[in-house]
């Protein structure tokens, strides 16, 4: 596991900038008003890939061996030819003029932001195991706060060479969307992280099938991104889309809060579609608003900063919301067993000789007789639930579903905060010049928005 984490970190060094860099390149070569359309296409493709990836990965993971190599290893190997093809295409087609500018690299800023965020992410994930007031948790709090304080101090001294120049936050749009990005990221990734768990643990779907069952979410993202991009390109108005989109995300998350262990899939699919429509209307216009509000020379840093804040919010959201899930699931499973124990069907099942003889059922039956804990072991391994007798499996599914409902409700609450902040998002007229054209000598300064707005 440590090797996996280390190599993923190495992979992240190269991959971390690809998403924001693609959006920054669009910002450089396409005027904001026309850019909305292309960013809509970009996010639609991204959403499609987000579903195809888990499906393909699940297919590989489900194979014991392919060409003499363990199936799950192909999840990583398949990226090599895809990355090579992308490298060749970019090298042959992306030929943009660029000017070199001497600047200092903000090594200290990169170190301090890592020192600040890693301990906070760690305690958000491990706090339920360590104890939120334990020595290790307190150490993470202190190191995290000191690291972030040192990062802010370093950025103020680095000026224009900072990872995130402090002057950016004097721009109202950038400052507001940075906070919104953290909040939306928390609600988005934190809430959605429970969906595959619901589909696999509660509904019993395989990893491949659960990826396919996320298609309504992807369809919503595609429709929301493309429609908002087309309308913004025609009207030049963008503020209404993230406001309406965040409202749809809240509605979708609240609807997901009401799904249960026996909810038909079509109802879950409708909830995901509503949430995806909202998400598609939020991500693209927010990026567009940031790029339009900043001077052309700052678009790259501003775009990557916005992506950074969203990813950090997402990482915190996943860690915090999964902590909520797993800290409550044990008690909810026990409550579900207490309720089921009173039903004739459950009593019939536990007294059935065939059920008692099945070795998969024996640990649960022993726990029911007081020889173990119900719910504790399921946190680390849930695969056995799908092999249990249906009557014994149902309380586990109900317990997980109840905890996931809480996660969706917390996610909706976080998204409400984002919705309120988006109401105050300034709407600056979209420029008709690309950033590249605006930087050319003789370009009218009117193409650059007022940095104070």
Give the ranges of each region predicted by the language model:
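Helix-loop-helix hairpins in multi-pass membrane proteins, especially solute transporters
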Residues: 1-108, 135, 219
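Transmembrane core module of solute transporters
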Residues: 3-5, 108, 130-301, 317, ...
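MFS-fold secondary transporters
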Residues: 11, 90, 255-256, 275, ...
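Small-residue-rich alpha-helical segments with characteristic i,i+4
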Residues: 19-20, 36-48, 52, 62, ...
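Hydrophobic/small/kink-forming positions within alpha-helical transmembrane segments
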Residues: 47, 51, 55, 114, ...
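Interfacial helix-cap and linker-helix signal at transmembrane-aqueous boundaries
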Residues: 56-69, 124, 199-200, 231-232, ...
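C-terminal membrane-cytosol helix-exit motif in multi-pass small-molecule transporters
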Residues: 80-98, 114-126, 144-158, 418-427
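Transmembrane-helix exit segments and adjacent C-terminal regions of multi-pass membrane proteins
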Residues: 85, 89, 98, 133, ...
């Amino acid at each position: 596991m440590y090797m996996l984490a280390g190599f993923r970190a190495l992979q992240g060094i190269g991959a971390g900038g690809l998403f924001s860099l693609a959006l920054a390149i669009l910002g450089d070569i396409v005027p904001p008003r026309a850019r909305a359309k292309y960013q809509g296409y970009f996010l639609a493709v991204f959403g499609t890939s987000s579903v195809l990836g888990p499906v393909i990965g699940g297919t590989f993971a489900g194979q014991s061996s392919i060409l003499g190599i363990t199936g799950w290893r192909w999840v990583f190997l398949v990226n090599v030819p895809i990355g090579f093809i992308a490298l060749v295409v970019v090298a042959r087609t992306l030929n943009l003029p660029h000017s070199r500018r001497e600047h200092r690299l903000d090594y200290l800023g990169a170190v301090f932001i890592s020192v600040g965020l890693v301990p906070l992410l760690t305690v958000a994930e491990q706090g339920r195991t360590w104890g939120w007031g334990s020595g290790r948790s307190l150490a993470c709090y202190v190191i995290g706060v000191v690291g972030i304080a040192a990062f802010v101090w370093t950025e103020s001294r680095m000026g224009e060479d900072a990872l995130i120049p402090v002057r950016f936050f004097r721009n109202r749009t950038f400052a507001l969307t940075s906070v919104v990005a953290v909040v939306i990221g928390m609600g988005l990734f934190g809430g959605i992280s429970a969906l595959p768990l619901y589909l696999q643990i509660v509904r019993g779907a395989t990893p491949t099938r659960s990826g396919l069952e996320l298609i309504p979410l992807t369809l919503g993202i595609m429709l929301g991104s493309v429609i908002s991009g087309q309308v913004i390109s025609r009207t030049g108005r963008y503020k209404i889309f993230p406001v309406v989109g965040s409202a749809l995300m809240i509605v979708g998350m609240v609807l997901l809060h009401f799904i249960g262990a026996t909810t038909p899939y079509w109802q879950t699919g409708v909830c995901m579609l509503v949430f995806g429509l909202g998400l598609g209307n939020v991500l693209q216009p927010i990026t567009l608003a940031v790029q339009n509000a900043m001077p052309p020379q700052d678009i790259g840093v501003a775009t990557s900063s916005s992506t950074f804040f969203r990813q950090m919010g997402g990482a915190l959201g996943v860690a915090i919301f999964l902590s909520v899930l797993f800290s409550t699931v044990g008690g909810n499973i026990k409550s579900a067993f207490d309720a089921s124990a009173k039903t004739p069907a459950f009593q019939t099942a536990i007294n059935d000789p065939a059920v008692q003889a099945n070795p998969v059922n024996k640990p649960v039956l022993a726990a029911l007789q007081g020889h173990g804990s119900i719910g504790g072991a399921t946190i680390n391994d849930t695969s056995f639930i799908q092999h249990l007798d249906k009557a014994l499996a149902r309380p586990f599914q109900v317990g997980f579903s109840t905890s996931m409902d809480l996660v969706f409700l917390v996610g909706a609450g976080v998204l409400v905060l984002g919705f309120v902040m988006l109401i105050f998002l300034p709407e600056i007229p979209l420029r008709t010049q690309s950033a590249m054209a605006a930087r050319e000598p003789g370009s009218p300064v009117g193409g650059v928005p007022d940095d104070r707005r």
